[in-house]
Amino acid sequence: MRKKLIAGNWKMNGSLAANEALVKGLRVGVGASVCQVALCVPSVYLAQCQALLVGTAIALGAQDLSQHEVGAFTGEISGAMLQEFGVRYCIVGHSERRQYHFETDALVAAKAQRALACGITPIVCVGETLAEREAGRTEEVVKRQLAAVIHANGHCISEVVVAYEPVWAIGTGKTASIEQAQQVHSVLRQQLQAASIQADRIQIIYGGSMNAANAAELLAQPDIDGGLVGGASLKVPDFLSIIASAC
């Protein structure tokens, strides 16, 4: 039985004071959760959040890492650096990185490989745009994106988390229907099963505007193993509600 994973993606939000208040609220509410909880925070706040999360069941996560191990790559952050701060999860290939930073499938696969090499679980994001969905290309797109990661990481694919994030549902308030979300998760599960005998242990989480109102129904689906939560992860009551739905 796969445990549910609820990962908060703070994106480019937060401040020292706000972070402290948020994590303190979560510390009280999460307790000894039976599901897995992570916070993927801006890199400048990793040290602060590492200290704030000591003694909790909440794992620390990052939002990106370099595909390079070390070297003259100004502005980049390596997996080894993240590892020193106790980072356990790292988002790779988020649609905002693909869109605004022109990250390709091959680059995302290389970043996932680098995370795994550093003992960090990559949360590999895949998803289609509205135009791709309306053109009937959803399955083609998500399978292509995931195939690159499978090809680059081979037997290690069982160590990743996959996040399906319909791009048209991120930050828009729109959500894929329960049926749409489960259908894509099922496609991804089948692709993983063809690639690994351990596919049934791989968590596939949903990242398209999961919130307190829709979390329970989404998380009840057989192939939805958690959520990559954006805006709702910045609000203690909402994030705790989603965690409760998963646990």
UniProtKB/Swiss-Prot annotation:
It is found in: Cytoplasm. Keywords: Cytoplasm, Gluconeogenesis, Glycolysis, Isomerase. InterPro entries: Aldolase_TIM (IPR013785), TIM_sf (IPR035990), TrioseP_Isoase_bac/euk (IPR022896), Triosephosphate_isomerase (IPR000652), Triosephosphate_isomerase_AS (IPR020861). The active site is at 94 (electrophile), 165 (proton acceptor). Its EC number is 5.3.1.1. The keyword Nuclease does not apply. PROSITE patterns: TIM_1, TIM_2. GO terms for cellular component: cytosol. One of its GO terms (molecular function) is triose-phosphate isomerase activity. One of its GO terms (biological process) is gluconeogenesis. Pathway: Carbohydrate biosynthesis; gluconeogenesis; Carbohydrate degradation; glycolysis; D-glyceraldehyde 3-phosphate from glycerone phosphate: step 1/1. Its main location: cytoplasm. It is an enzyme of class 5 (isomerase). It catalyses: D-glyceraldehyde 3-phosphate = dihydroxyacetone phosphate. The keyword Cytoplasm applies. Pfam families: TIM. Substrate binds at residues 9-11, 171, 209, 230-231. PANTHER family: TRIOSEPHOSPHATE ISOMERASE. Homodimer. Involved in the gluconeogenesis. Catalyzes stereospecifically the conversion of dihydroxyacetone phosphate (DHAP) to D-glyceraldehyde-3-phosphate (G3P). Belongs to the triosephosphate isomerase family. This is Triosephosphate isomerase.
